[in-house]
């Protein structure tokens, strides 16, 4: 299982981005979290197989129709915490 951190920048708050991210991650079968950041970005921690992460990364590059994704930063997550079902944090 891979663990990846993503930070998505653009018009990604107030447009349903967290909900659609949760929906896509759940469809793919990922575990993890999604939450808004104070700087206007969205933080995502995703855990899954390489093919699941690849599919999710492709979706994040454009997001839902209501959003405008300018860029996505990706890093490996080195923490030891395991996540349950994908959830939205407030």
Curated annotation (Swiss-Prot):
Record's keyword annotation contains Lipid metabolism: no
Principal EC category: hydrolase
Listed EC numbers: 3.6.1.7
Residue pairs linked by disulfide bridges in the UniProt entry: none
Catalysis performed (reactions): an acyl phosphate + H2O = a carboxylate + phosphate + H(+)
GO molecular function terms attached to this record: acylphosphatase activity
PROSITE patterns linked to this entry: ACYLPHOSPHATASE_1, ACYLPHOSPHATASE_3
Family per record: Belongs to the acylphosphatase family.
Name of the protein in question: Acylphosphatase
């Amino acid at each position: 299982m891979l663990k990846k951190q993503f930070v998505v920048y653009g018009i990604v708050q107030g447009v349903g981005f967290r909900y659609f991210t949760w929906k896509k991650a759940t469809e793919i079968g990922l575990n993890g979290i999604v939450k808004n950041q104070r700087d206007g970005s969205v933080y995502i921690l995703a855990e899954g197989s390489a093919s699941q992460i690849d599919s999710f990364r492709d979706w994040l590059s454009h997001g839902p129709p209501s959003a405008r994704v300018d860029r996505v930063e990706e890093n490996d997550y080195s923490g030891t915490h395991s996540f349950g079902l994908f959830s939205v944090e407030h």
